[in-house]
Amino acid sequence: MSEKFFEIFEKKLEKLKEQNLYRSVKDMESRHGMEITIQGKKYINFASNDYLGLSQHPLVKEAGIDAIKTFGAGGGASRLLSGGTILHRKLEELLSEFKNTESCLILNSGYTANTSLIPALAGENDIIFSDELNHASIIDGCRLSRAEKIIYKHADIEDLKKLIRNISCKGKKVIITDTVFSMDGDIAPIRELYELCKAEGALLYIDDAHGTGVLGNGYGILKHLGLQTEAFVIQMGTLSKAIGVFGAFVCGDSSIIDWFINSARGFIFSTSLPPSTVASAYASLKIIMEDKELIKRLWQNIEKVMEIIKNLELKTTKTQTPIIPILFENIEQAIKASRILYDSGIYAPVIRPPTVKTPRIRITITAGHSDNDIEKLSGALTLLNSIF
């Protein structure tokens, strides 16, 4: 019987390979700045979400090492048992200050956050309105919720208005969106969503994973748009992208955060983040709040690469962020393009269905990229352009 089960999986994998949809893991042997080594060969990494390069900042690494010396390597238990430390509390207080909210809770990953917080926030008799291009973790969080789910067209505020105004709801209406869409790099119409929630008495749950540390001088989407923090806005974000470490957080009204502590299953039933991770995230966040040079450098690099893309007339999206996709007509072209970049010393893997509808190379820019790195990327993209 077990052999038959294995055959089922083998056939499924074979089908993925035939369709060029099979994925495999490539592991780094070392990393120095934006230079990585894979199977003995060095590449410039243009596939990292470490937008400010803070994962390798000396103060961030030192903070983690010091925490291990004081608290050990692991959390040991959930926060509701004995897994919490003063470091966890200090990070939550700093994140509350950073996002200008009453309270904050840290969780173990962005995926854990969305699949735990959304079911805790919206349940029976509630209605969720979710952007059609929201991250997989939001989609899965909505599926786990007992609320009714309504999908609106991507970033289409008029479509959402029609939907939200033409449906009756016994409970809460909750609008959920990424702020920056991770595969296209575009920004959601947050100002319009904010005003719509105000008018309709709805909650606004925003996933600012790719906006935190990048937009609004580092403070995220609300600061970027000059919007005030309000009780109806719940701000989720991650510690793993611009902050450069690992984990996630949610900031908002103290009563909502307290409810999450008591009902978000991914928080209640998970061992806490290691103290070293928390200490490193705290050090990183302090750098973002106090030193704006890295953010300035990031945006300078984004402008340089966007100019290269424009001059080469490569097909891209309406990106407004460090995420710069190069689009291709089919999977075969995208795979070939990724190999050309790979052979040129540029690490930028192909993104294929079902992650996205249109195959692409997703280039991400960081403050850690040097002028030489960008020049090397320019040469590789020029070669790419001559072939396609």
Swiss-Prot record:
Its cofactor is pyridoxal 5'-phosphate. Pyridoxal 5'-phosphate binds at residues 110-111, 182, 207-210, 238-241. Pathway: Cofactor biosynthesis; biotin biosynthesis. The modification N6-(pyridoxal phosphate)lysine is found at residue 241. The keyword Transferase applies. It comes from Thermodesulfovibrio yellowstonii (strain ATCC 51303 / DSM 11347 / YP87). The gene is bioF. GO terms for molecular function: 8-amino-7-oxononanoate synthase activity; pyridoxal phosphate binding. Keywords: Biotin biosynthesis, Pyridoxal phosphate, Transferase. It holds the Pfam family Aminotran_1_2. Catalyzes the decarboxylative condensation of pimeloyl-[acyl-carrier protein] and L-alanine to produce 8-amino-7-oxononanoate (AON), [acyl-carrier protein], and carbon dioxide. It catalyses: 6-carboxyhexanoyl-[ACP] + L-alanine + H(+) = (8S)-8-amino-7-oxononanoate + holo-[ACP] + CO2. Homodimer. This is Putative 8-amino-7-oxononanoate synthase. GO terms for biological process: biotin biosynthetic process. Its EC number is 2.3.1.47.
